[in-house]
Amino acid sequence: NTEICAEFIQKAVGGDLFEVETVNGYSSDYHACTAEAKTEYENNTRPELKAYLKDISGYDNIFICGPCWCGTYPMAVFSLIESLNFQGKNVMPLMTHEGSGLGRSMQDINRICKGAVIKTGLAVHGADASKSEQAVTKWAKESLNV
């Protein structure tokens, strides 16, 4: 669902995509994956990633997209963004969810992305992600004043 929304953003305003993938991966079973996510959240774990962005200095605008796990982004997203310098960047959070909206993600993004201008976030119901192109496109363009 999140990937679909990220692709809608790219189609609407351009840019590069970077997929956050953990070294160990997550279970494809929903209940097992949920349990893994909960354990990571409760332990404030930062899972190792297959790849990291080293530098975002060439970008002015960063869309941070992810599913809502335990009321915020997956801990793997934090593994990535906590090491980046967001000073002077525009950050647009998007979260796919199944009922929790943006959860605490805006507070977390504000805390982590020091020096950034945090724009209004967008919550997309996961079950409706494939039908959300118009809403995602409108939000992405408005976020960039395009």
Protein language model annotation of sequence segments:
Residues Y73-P74, L102:
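Alpha-helix N-cap/helix-start motif
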Residues G14-D16, N90, V117:
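Residues at the starts of beta-strands that form the adenosine-phosphate
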Residues M75-F78, M106-Q107:
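Short amphipathic alpha-helical segments
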Residues M92-K131:
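Short, glycine-/small-residue-rich phosphate/pyrophosphate-handling segment
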Residues N1-I64, G71, F78, E82, ...:
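N-terminal beta1-alpha1-beta2 submodule of the flavodoxin-like/Rossmannoid cofactor-binding fold
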Residues P67-C70, E98-G99:
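Short beta->alpha junction loops/turns
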Residues I56, E82-G88, I112-C113:
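Short, conserved loop/helix-junction motifs that constitute active-site signature segments
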Residues I64-C65, P93:
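Redox-cofactor binding/interface segments in oxidoreductases and associated redox assembly factors
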